[in-house]
Amino acid sequence: MLTGCGSSAISYFPYGDEGTGGRAYEKVTSASDISLMSDGICVLSDKNVNKLTDKPSFNAKSVIVANEESAIYAKNCFKKMYPASLTKMMTAYVVFTKESDLDRVVKINGEAIKITEPYAKKMRLMDGDQLTIRQLLNAALVTSANDAAKALAVAVSGSEEKFVLLMNEEAKKIGATHSRFVNSTGLHDNAHYTTLYDQYLIFHKLLEIPEFVKIINQGSYTVEYKNALGNKVTTKVTSTNQYLAGLLRVPDGYTVIGGKTGTTDEAGSCILMSFKSSADKNYIVGILKASDSLNLYAQLGTVFENLPQNASN
């Protein structure tokens, strides 16, 4: 079994057929900033790894911390889990892969994007609203709007059912072969599942796309569009990432690039996030099924506190 990170490492993985204050995040300003971790993919065995200082333990079900060279921490990365809104990363990847014009205007079909779950996050898009693909991507990734994710699916494939076929097809191409997607949102379905390693692969692939990195790097997003009557609608949404939203301060020596969060009762609180040290070293952290948001960010804090001493200098 090979382990480590490298541009060709993935081909060796035997994965089957199937507070406030301080600088909370770094603004990505040019394509040259977006190298991130697109050069090396970590290949893991099914054994847990702990190279963090003080050897902390995590009570989340699945955890990964990786840099360009190796996995620093890995726990239950191949365990079957529910992804919640991390699903929207795969939705975004399919859009980036299949849609040639991100500025194409989409007219919303209210019935096709209906969200019935009472507490699901929404932009409250209405029948006849007109938004671009780019605006819908921002809404789905920054604030995790479920109606925006469904609108993207319908815009690209004509229906969410057809779009889901593409999600599963593209996931297999990436190597995420232990996932099954049945919707574009991540709203719970027992038949909709993943592993943390699959989510790592999807996120890693997305970090190669400059537009994705620009979107996830935002603390908030303001969208202006026309409704069915031709009137302008302006909506400002806030990132679901508490570091980017300015609710938490990133420890000195590190800056957060961005990522995707997810929460359902069944999935718990989840995150995939990219950050880097002042030594310009890039990291990905993934956590699935923390007990709640407070616990999730406490565990992220533990990651920052226990990275090897030379990470931030």
Please give the residue ranges for each predicted region:
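Domain-terminus/edge residues, biased toward the C-terminal soluble/receptor-binding domains
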Residues: 6-11, 176-177, 188-193, 197-313
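Active-site-adjacent loops and short helices of periplasmic peptidoglycan-processing enzymes
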Residues: 9-197, 201, 206-207
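Sec-dependent bacterial lipoprotein signal peptides
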Residues: 1-3
